[in-house]
Amino acid sequence: MSPAEPTREESVYKAKLAEQAERYEEMVEYMERVARAAGGASGGEELTVEERNLLSVAYKNVIGARRASWRIISSIEQKEEGRGNDAHAATIRSYRGKIEAELARICDGILALLDSHLVPSAGAAESKVFYLKMKGDYHRYLAEFKSGDERKQAAESTMNAYKAAQDIALADLAPTHPIRLGLALNFSVFYYEILNSPDRACNLAKQAFDEAISELDSLGEESYKDSTLIMQLLRDNLTLWTSDANDDGGDEIKEAAAPKEPGDQ
């Protein structure tokens, strides 16, 4: 006799345990199970704020480790090519391909879940923006390492998702809302890193920052910490992007982190 399928509550609890143990692949499995169970419910039930945040944290950690690995390996590859070490460079390219296959598998997994369950079941504006931003993020991660037509397609999909999220955010979320600010942060990073459009990146980031600062006095205590943190990241990127040409470019561009608690971005 096969064991009973775990309940939604059991899967959420196991995901929390996996997070504490830093076993993020298992955390992804548990939260995918929750998302599919909710999406398969009558009418497609929406995830709770806690559940969607757990899903985001799980995937952000799984993808984040591979993105960091890819950057390190790509840097080593460039150095070996510069030294003329063709044999080493070929070995590194093969190893980079393995990491890229893992990145693609992870991105394809969450993008399929977003399209089949999460975006269609999202009712509130906040949820729609959250998931569309997430969709844009994972298409952007594909664009980071793809080339040619695949990169172009990933960039177009990123733009479409971020633009759809932005349209809803501008209409329905306050300028100080952490999810709206996180969207602006990541959208501006997309302009800068993927589209090589520093002017558009700076304009988007500055507008989001200025609009939020003008309404900061009306911000509730609950969101104040979250919002001001992302505003600081927007400012950090603006400083980096507008710094003089003598800068060594060693500073890291900031993105919106996965939420740690309900409401965080």
Curated annotation (Swiss-Prot):
GO cellular component: cytoplasm
Signal sequence annotation: none
Compositional bias per record (Basic and acidic residues), positions renumbered to this chain: 251-265
Coiled-coil ranges per UniProt: none
Species annotation: Oryza sativa subsp. japonica (Rice)
Renumbered residue ranges of the record's region Disordered: 244-265
Pfam families: 14-3-3
Function: Is associated with a DNA binding complex that binds to the G box, a well-characterized cis-acting DNA regulatory element found in plant genes.
Protein's name according to its UniProt entry: 14-3-3-like protein GF14-D
Family that this chain belongs to: Belongs to the 14-3-3 family.
Swiss-Prot/TrEMBL GO biological process terms: protein localization; signal transduction
Family matches, as SMART domains: 14_3_3
